[in-house]
């Protein structure tokens, strides 16, 4: 029993000595794909679009290979939809989300250059939406352009989101207290952006890949 207690104390001392906090900022670009069931809309075309992601991050390292990381970021989830038959119909949508991913961070490698893998879940809130493009007016028989804010409709739009998140990257220790990171991260939404208020079910999901750089201060 005495040996077990001593072993536990030794383990806790090692863990505590290796534990450290870090905070930082991140920024980069993301490519979003909007997945939907087109049903009867056979000429409806949906394409992904690039956006921007910016955020702050905090991480607590339990050991030199395991940490708990939480980010707060602003991420755009943009997409474009058009019609194959009616080439004048072209909508470019820009969607801003506030996201909170919480992840386990696994690290491996040498002292200065290390690889890492982040796995976890995220919650998000749809802040606003904007659309720009052109459409066809059947009454006037002409094309018109628009550039406007999209108003949310509570019965239709699901503004809360959550899903799975994972990422891989490299970290370079610049000095004892500063480190730079490069990461490719993937967000997989599990909640449809539309509420099922109509007879025909209409499920729509975001899948977002972010390429981001970051700088961390290590305490």
Model-derived features: where do they sit?
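Solvent-exposed, glycine/polar-rich loop segments of beta-barrel outer-membrane systems
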Residues: 134-152, 196-203
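Bacterial Sec-dependent N-terminal signal peptides
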Residues: 1-26, 215-219
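Extracellular loop and loop/strand-boundary signature of outer-membrane beta-barrel proteins
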Residues: 39-45, 85-92, 151-156, 197-203
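Short helix-to-loop capping/linker segments positioned immediately adjacent to catalytic or ligand/cofactor-binding
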Residues: 104-110, 153-157, 169
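Short glycine/proline- and aromatic-enriched beta-strand/turn motifs that initiate or cap beta-hairpins
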Residues: 19-58, 157, 218-219
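Short sequence motifs at beta-strands and strand-loop junctions characteristic
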Residues: 46-51, 92-97, 154-163, 205-207
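Gram-negative (and chloroplast) outer-membrane scaffold detector with strong preference
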Residues: 21, 29-35, 59-141, 174-176, ...
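Predominantly the C-terminal beta-signal and adjacent terminal strand-loop region
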Residues: 156, 161, 166, 172-219
């Amino acid at each position: 029993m005495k040996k077990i207690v001593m072993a536990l104390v030794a383990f806790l001392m090692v863990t505590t000595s290796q534990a450290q906090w870090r905070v930082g900022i991140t920024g980069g670009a993301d490519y979003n794909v909007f997945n939907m069931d087109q049903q009867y809309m056979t000429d409806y075309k949906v394409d992904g679009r690039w956006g921007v992601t910016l955020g702050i991050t905090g991480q607590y390292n339990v050991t030199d290979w395991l940490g708990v990381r939480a980010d707060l970021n602003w991420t755009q989830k943009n997409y474009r939809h058009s019609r194959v038959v009616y080439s004048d119909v072209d909508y470019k949508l820009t969607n801003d989300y506030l996201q909170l991913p919480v992840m386990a961070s696994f690290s491996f490698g040498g002292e200065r250059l290390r690889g890492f893998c982040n796995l976890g879940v995220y919650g998000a809130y749809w802040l606003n939406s904007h659309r720009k493009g052109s459409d066809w007016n059947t009454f006037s028989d002409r094309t018109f352009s628009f550039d406007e804010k999209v108003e949310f409709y509570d019965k239709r739009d699901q503004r809360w989101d959550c899903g799975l998140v994972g990422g891989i990257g490299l970290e370079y220790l610049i000095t004892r207290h500063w480190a730079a990171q490069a990461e490719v991260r993937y967000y997989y939404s599990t909640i449809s952006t539309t509420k099922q208020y109509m007879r025909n079910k209409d499920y729509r999901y975001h899948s977002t890949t972010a390429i981001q750089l970051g700088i961390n201060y290590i305490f």
